C-alpha cells in the first residue's frame, strides 16, 4: 500500500525504506 516491499489488505509490511 505505502512503503515496504509487499502489501496485504491494503496495508504495508516489510522494511519501509
UniProtKB/Swiss-Prot annotation:
It is found in: Secreted. The keyword Secreted applies. GO terms for biological process: neuropeptide signaling pathway. Signal peptide: none annotated. The modification Leucine amide is found at residue 17. Keywords: Amidation, Neuropeptide, Secreted. GO terms for cellular component: extracellular region. Transmembrane segments: none annotated. It comes from the Eukaryota. InterPro entries: Pyrokinin_CS (IPR001484). The keyword Secreted applies. Its main location: secreted. One of its GO terms (molecular function) is neuropeptide hormone activity. Myoactive. Belongs to the pyrokinin family. This is Pyrokinin-5.
Amino acid at each position: 500500500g505505502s512503503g515496504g516491499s509487499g502489501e496485504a489488505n491494503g496495508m504495508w509490511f516489510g522494511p519501509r525504506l
